[in-house]
């Protein structure tokens, strides 16, 4: 990052802190609350359930419980009720309603491996403020998700290394004061079955000791031939109010997931005619096991009326192993798909500890909410991927149009990767939220991070490493034109070490980015509908992209993304709730090479995308509490392979939903998805790794309050 950019940010921060000329005589307040993880529904906090679709508070943008309308940055909150109404358990599906989020590599259907926000791809996402995607963890389960929050633009000054497009933070369900048990079971097209149980239990009469267990079991087939998955998910959590000033929260997750590794279909000559979206090009026994265990705790203590202390730690361990038959480029005959046979054996450990001091006070005639935080992370990963070639004189190919399965597995020469990666990082971050007047608010933040990475390559007996220091910053202003309408602007920087090795076995230079944003926030219809419209411009250096010639990543130089997005959520009337988004994103490589030329579109990012979900809930009569609704999703054409002309066509889908509330304790649901049976492709990595979208399908569900 250039010194001029850093200097401009520093100047803005100093100016905001030092300028008291904005002060007015009338009183002004900083609308912030301490986090109450055991709040009831009627008192929303940054971690509580959301009434309807409209969240009013978040901690993702500031790590403090802050009113969303007071945050000088775009943030989308997709509550669990959206997934419930859609009859979906997919984080990907929820992100359709965040605005400007694009689907990327899902690692053969195994993980939430990558996605894009505002044009830039990231493999980072967070759970309760902790990095949650180190290694290859299984896809997050909806059973214990309370909210999915997307902070738009760089957030490195708060979360550390990351991408400048944005940050996804999943807020998990916390123990509540009232006892309840909810059982939901569902069945759907292609023999998909799921049962989820949510048991919340106060363990003492005073409500100081609480427990909650979320459990889910899945057994799914697919519209894709021979593709199936099984999952068991258990997430116990405990909350203990030790005394009026001290609170302890312990959360755990255990996942056992097995699924068929599925890279999708092949597009012959970059076209689709004659290729069935159900055709599976692997082998029916290509199964990958993914086991994950996680435990984390957070201890909050109120030191006095001004200062509070938070100590939190997170440990995650995972293993992924199995075999896969993966497509390679199509042969000259236009129907023979070459394949490679791969064995994977990976494991990882990640431990993170955070210590934060928070204070709320007046200084220089202004109100401040200060956060001083430190973070230490120790991440270790063993990764072995073995390519097993066919013996001489044989092939391991399959016919694209008439696949025949059950070929003997290759047993020839072995090659691939085998390495140990160790990453340690230490960070100090500072943040100040400031009330200048009753209308003008500001935010400044900075983070210093030291990063050490070492990779022991067992195939070459070579050790490589990198050591990086990074200073990232963020500053923003929000001006309230009226009680319902505010203008905001911000600028922030990002830093992310590029993990892994290039084709020559060397580590990459780190990515650096800067983002600018300006927008308007509105609270409409008597504060029933929240809207945010913002324009952005983001630049990034040392962007990694897949080089098809070597099947490895490379740093292509520079990229730029700019555009605008609109998001809205609310309870428009007592009966109608809506959530929707629209985004225009112009994302391209601005400094490339022969393989990925300057001007190339960034992989998987549509210029135009939009979504809308509306639900009508009956307020009277025998249908009181029942609802009907519809969802619409549009995604424009996208680059299907870096540096080529291969594109995925635009698509649009329509879903219908209905829930019948038979009694206070029994609800029956029906979801009809892609009712017009649109044939579409939701993501790709190349023209021989293309993931088709689901055809028309249905899900029926039964929910019992026990």
Question: What is each stretch, according to the model?
Answer:
Residues 33-179, 183, 518:
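Acidic, small-polar-rich N-terminal luminal/periplasmic segments of exported/outer-membrane proteins
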Residues 134, 144-146, 157-236, 242-246, ...:
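Outer-membrane beta-barrel translocator/receptor signature
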Residues 218-222, 234-302, 315-348, 392-421, ...:
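Acidic/polar loop-and-plug regions of large Gram-negative outer-membrane beta-barrel proteins
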Residues 239-243, 253, 348, 367-379, ...:
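Structural signature of Gram-negative outer-membrane beta-barrels, strongest in the C-terminal barrel
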Residues 298-318, 340-456:
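Face-selective signature of the C-terminal outer-membrane beta-barrel domain
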Residues 298-314, 318-324, 487, 510-571, ...:
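Membrane-embedded beta-barrel scaffold of Gram-negative outer-membrane proteins
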Residues 537, 555-642, 676, 705:
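Gram-negative outer-membrane beta-barrel transporters
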Residues 573, 633-641, 656-706:
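C-terminal beta-signal and adjacent terminal beta-strands/loops
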